[in-house]
Regions:
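Soluble metallo-hydrolase cores and metallopeptidase-like ectodomains found primarily
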Residues: 1-38, 56
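Domain-scale recognition of functional cores that engage charged ligands
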Residues: 2, 15, 40-53, 99
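Active-site-adjacent substrate-binding region
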Residues: 2-7, 11, 119-198
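Acidic, glycine-rich active-site loops and adjacent beta-strand->loop/helix elements
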Residues: 24-26, 68-75, 116-118, 165-169, ...
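A short glycine/serine-rich beta->alpha loop
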Residues: 31-41, 72-77
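Catalytic-loop motifs flanking and including active-site residues across diverse enzymes
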Residues: 42-49, 185, 207, 211
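Acidic/histidine-rich catalytic neighborhood of metal-dependent amide-processing enzymes
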Residues: 48-135, 222-223
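His/Asp/Glu-rich mid-to-C-terminal helical/loop segments that flank catalytic regions of hydrolases
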Residues: 54-68, 191-223
Length: 223
C-alpha cells in the first residue's frame, strides 16, 4: 500500500524520519467556539504566531530574527536543535557583516523563547498550583519576564504569569536556558495548552491572538 500510494520502499525506512499522527482535522470547541482542538499545538501554535508576527514587521528599529528549532522534546539535540551551532553560525555571519562582535550582539539582544505552557486543568488539579498557573483564554502566558512587560502593556497585550506545574510534580522544559547561556536576556512565553502532549490538545483563541500580538510588539519595540 505504501509503495503503491506513495512510492515508498523498504530501503526508504533506513533513513526515513517518520511520525504517526492522528488523522482528524483541527476543530472549534465550545458553545462560543472560543477554543481550538487539534493534534500538535505544542509547539506549532507558537511557531505560527512567531512567523506570522515577523512577516508583518515592515521597518523594525532593531534586527529581528525568527529561529524555528526542532527536537526540543528530547533536549534540543541534533543539527536542527537549539543546542547546535546553527544559530551561532548564522549570528556570527550577521554580526561580521555589520562589524559587530558576536558577544556584544548577544549582550544587547532580547529573546522571546516561544513555547506553550500548561493551562490549569481542574480534572487534574493535584499537579497544579492554581494561583501560579495559566488559564485558558486569559492571555499570553509568561513564565518569566525581563524587560518585556512594559512593551506588552503598551501594545495592549493581555498576558498572565504562569508556572508549568506544582513543585516536585514534574514538568516540561523550553529552549530558554540555552539562549540564556549565550548571555541573552530571555523571556519564556507562549500559549497555555490543555492536555499537552495528548493526541488532542486544546488552546484558547484569545491566547493565540495575544501571543501573536505580543510577539509582534517585541519585534517592533524601539526600546
Amino acid at each position: 500500500l505504501l509503495n503503491r500510494k506513495y512510492g515508498i520502499t523498504e530501503e526508504d525506512f533506513i533513513s526515513a524520519e517518520l511520525s504517526a499522527v492522528p488523522a482528524f482535522n483541527a476543530c472549534d470547541i465550545g458553545f462560543d467556539r472560543s477554543l481550538i482542538g487539534s493534534y500538535g499545538h505544542d509547539d506549532r501554535v507558537c511557531a505560527y504566531a512567531c512567523l506570522a508576527a515577523i512577516l508583518q514587521v515592515k521597518e523594525p528599529r532593531h534586527t529581528c530574527v525568527c529561529m524555528l528549532a526542532d527536537k526540543e522534546e528530547i533536549g534540543s539535540e541534533g543539527v536542527t536543535g537549539m543546542k547546535s551551532a546553527a544559530f551561532d553560525t548564522f549570528m556570527t555571519d550577521l554580526c561580521e557583516s555589520q562589524g559587530v562582535p558576536l558577544r556584544v550582539c548577544y549582550e544587547k539582544s532580547f529573546c522571546l523563547s516561544a513555547d506553550v505552557t500548561a493551562a490549569y486543568d481542574p480534572n487534574f488539579a493535584d499537579v497544579y498550583e492554581k494561583r501560579n498557573s495559566a488559564f485558558v483564554n486569559y492571555g499570553m502566558g509568561l513564565c518569566k519576564y525581563t524587560r518585556a512587560r512594559r512593551v506588552l502593556d503598551e501594545a495592549n497585550v493581555v498576558w498572565q504569569m504562569a508556572e508549568l506545574g506544582k513543585v516536585d510534580a514534574g514538568g516540561g522544559g523550553t529552549v530558554a536556558a540555552y539562549m540564556a547561556q549565550r548571555d541573552i536576556d530571555t523571556l519564556d512565553a507562549g500559549v497555555p495548552v490543555l492536555s499537552m502532549h495528548a493526541p488532542f490538545e486544546t488552546v484558547g483563541k484569545l491566547d493565540c491572538y495575544m501571543t501573536f500580538k505580543g510577539m509582534k510588539a517585541v519585534f517592533e519595540s524601539t526600546k
